[in-house]
Amino acid sequence: MEHIRTPKVEQVRLLQRRAGQRKPLLGTLYLSATHTIFVENHPETRRETWVLHSMVSGLERPPGGPTGSQLVLRCKDFRVFHLLFPLERDCVDVHASLTRLSRPESYRELYCLSINPNTNQEEREKSWSLVLPSQDYQRMGLPNNLWVATAANSEYKMCDSYPAQLFVSRWASPAVLMGSSRFRSRGRLPVLSYFHQDTLAAVCRCSQPLSGFSGRSEEDEQMVTAVMKANPGSDFIYVVDTRPRLNAMANRAAGKGYESEDHYGNIKLHFSGIDNIHVMRSSQQRILDVGEQRTPSMSDFLLGLENSGWLKHIKAVLDAGVFIAKAIADEGVSVLVHCSDGWDRTAQACSVASVLLEPYYRTMKGLMVLIEKDWVSFGHKFSHRYGHLDGDPREVSPVLDQFLEVLWQLAQQFPCAFQFNERFLLDLRTLAYSCQDGTFLGNSEKERRSLRLQERSFSVWSRLWRDREKYWNPLYRAEQSQTQGVLRPNTTPYCFKMWKGLYSPAETPAPPAQTPVDFLSSVREGSQQLEQELANQQEVAAGGPAPLGTRQATGSPDRGANQLPEGGGTQEED
Amino acid sequence: MEFAELIKTPRVDGVVLHRPFMPTVEGTLCLTGHHLILSSRQDNTEELWLLHSNIDSIEKRFLGSLGTIIVKCKDLRMIQLDIPGMEECLNIGSSIEALSTLDSVSLMYPYFYRPMFEVIEDGWNSFLPEDAFKDLEAMTDEWRLSEVNRDFRVCTTYPPLVAVPRNVDDDTLRKAAGFRHGGRFPVLSYYHKKNGMVMMRSGQPLTGTNGRRCKEDERLINATLRPGKRGYVIDTRTISVAQQAKARGGGFETEANYPQWRRIHKAIERSNVLQDSLVKLVEACNDQSHSMDRWLSKLEASNWQTHVKEILTTACLAAQCIDREGASVLVHGTEGTDSTLQVTSLAQIILDPACRTIQGFQGLVEREWLQAGHPFAQRCSMSAYSNSKPRHEAPGFLLFLDCVWQVLRQFPCSFQFTEQLLVLLFEHAYASQFGTFLGNSAAERVRLSLPEKTVSLWSWVNRPQEIDHLSNPLYEPNSLVIWPSVAPQSLLLWEGVFLRWNRSPRCQEEAHEEMVHIIEYNKELQNKVNSLRRQLAQLETQEPPLQTP
């Protein structure tokens, strides 16, 4: 590779404090096209450390000492590596190379797009068909007599950050769609996100209206009425503006803003008070600092946690979801959700509400579909938010992190409700940042299509699905009360904890204790092997194929629910 | 009977009861000498039986002729009684207040309680010092059981039997006792089988301002050291607190007189500070209207988690000296009945796998708290809601249980019991039908004839059905020393106690049931497979291969 000045440096010391390491390792550092690789000299262990270039978020060169020159490597998964080079020249070279390698200027430079697309063609195509938003609309029973598909955006002409496939109220004419789109920031008109089959209420999403202080659009008002009409059970809808009220009001001065209850006769307005991406970015930096404090006192820690504001923001996101879920499930009233552009806070609020409302989204497959639909297809700007390319650092913000953390917080309250475990959330987070697959590249469906990602890369979902055994929550059982129906979390502040697995993984007891998840998973695995042996032995004992059914009949009929389905799930025909 | 004088109104009809996570019940309220009872006289609702001694304080409110009494319990629960009629309400209120603050121990419920279960093993005999010593004797002959305190004269807060170095005679012990706070001369707390090192505990040495010394005391503790080895004195107080203690006749071991000992000072807080923390913490937990910022700052300001961290850190230090440094340790604070016991008992949880079993943990509580003279009656007479000014009250035992919970949470598979056992001990330490936690010392328990006149908590706990209920399905005996992380990020608020009445336990219970289910199912399969294997093996041996066609 043209950017690698020195492919190999010997006698380098590496220290990773965050992993609980105390003494540096001595070894050789290699730079490849994709990874920084460190191989320990120790002949017995030869431990290897691999760091993807795309995971590097920062490089620093603190002043060197008599023992050599230092390079600090910070990663997007919050790992920090301290490297010590014997020669300053090597350090300078590695620094320069990594600076360039970790900040690709175009998608072309990304490793996942440099593979030969024609090998594994079948596998690649299969990987992209594993999770499709269309499957989810089908699952919700759409289209139906209330919600219909529209071709208005099939060429991305009405809204270039929306998907081609949109579901809208049956009562909205093409003219109303166009007019409403023109009156919404970046053309993001109200469309369906989630349809609740029990109450017929729906979660819809859009961006802020271009109302300014007094602007109106007849079509947009008709559009909102159409959303209301698509729910036969109620004569108004909630408009949830996920921003703090002050921010929403300030937007009016720029010709944007929020819906006036006077102009839209059939709405009730609710503000959720979720702060913007800049506040979130600096808040996360502060909670990271809290996690990295060396030997803090309890007061340092708790005050640091408070000052970071992070848990307050997590609570705000969950509260927004709870408000929407209650409106849908308890009141049977549809909700229209927006923030400013409708691709960050709106994605968070809609998907949190969906997880609370719909047990399917608490399964691995369900969460994948939800993220594919609410985030990927609806134009959450993955490449900007997670810094895939060298760009404006002010566009970077941990929006998806917060959604995943809300799920983690929920799993603390409902240990049996989710099919997946903490590892799944952590790995999913890493994959959103790491550019190893095509799914999260780009900022919209349109951009992804023009990059021809499906022809040039794999989908992230097949990678996660392949490892599903590792992500299984042993306490999950489909028929438990918390698995069914609507989740009603307690959102009192004392219910929120710092997500230690993400922000402070180094502080562990010694010897490392087995987690209940690992323990129960291994027991569960053991049970499966025993079941197998039992079946075999019964066969031998009976001198022929024994009635395998004894277990299902007498033992534990519910066990069937614990088996992970093989293959890609239900819609495999295509 | 005196109770009747205190009960102004024995029963009121039409009382409405509100309690956490249960439907509202309307029924008859009855006051007896020991209980507040509310019964709807219908089969499908659960009656309320509340011990008066569990009531920490009450609050009365009136709306017209409808009175409301909020009963705040020592186990931190709050219940509300709506009582029609102002006079009835006032009478009930003052009766409860009188009955819940009875001074005389002999009027306490344990003296009246008759067990409704069969006592399989009398808990009063389950953990006798002589039995514990038999285990020690099997490991070493360097220690003996001394009867120097047979009649509680040498030390009023020690049990009649204590383990001391074999080559130190009772006379030396008596003299050393004169040099230690409350007569609490250094005695054996724990013997570390792996390397023969020991942990001892005592009261502070009475050096005073002019640096008194006591040769016998020095000889006693030096007798526990191996030749050429040094030991550690862990003083649970800061150096400045220890210095100040000199003015009141106390003090600490100086380098000059104890050259073979290195002294380390820690900063575990004293009783009134701890009580204050408990009150603040519970107040913060009960206010659901807090914003996130306010909650975190209230939690911080209560300092509760700071105490947890400090106590665990000190226990880890003691354990480290013994296991890693291979040195013996003497632990004391001022009296040696509070922070000292927190440290010595937690260090044993860390070092000794036997303390992590159900029986072993009871034995630890018996040895290091009850026999060791933690003044339960004084410390646990009031809890977080009491309005009166605390005198001797302090949640030292609750803090110990909290620390055990932290370790249990970090090592979820290493304890034979669940959190439930810890919660149960917390409840019974503050209010109980059993006599175990009455009195302040072994001497008092003898004087009060508790073993003869009351039932032991251990008699109840150690029945198969209760053991079953307290067992941890994830338990796998772990013979290792376990080192908990004491970083603040690793220490959590003990929800099982402090948020117990604010959050529904249903989902966590479901998770627990599921764990039990997974493990039971595995055992069941294991049994089936084993019996099939045996059958197959039998078939093979009985039937030689002659029946081939």
Walk through the language-model features, giving the residues of each:
Chain A
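Ser/Thr-glycine-rich phosphate-binding loops at phosphate-binding pockets of nucleotides
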Residues: 341-347
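Hydrophobic anchor at the beta1->P-loop junction of P-loop NTPases
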Residues: 337-339
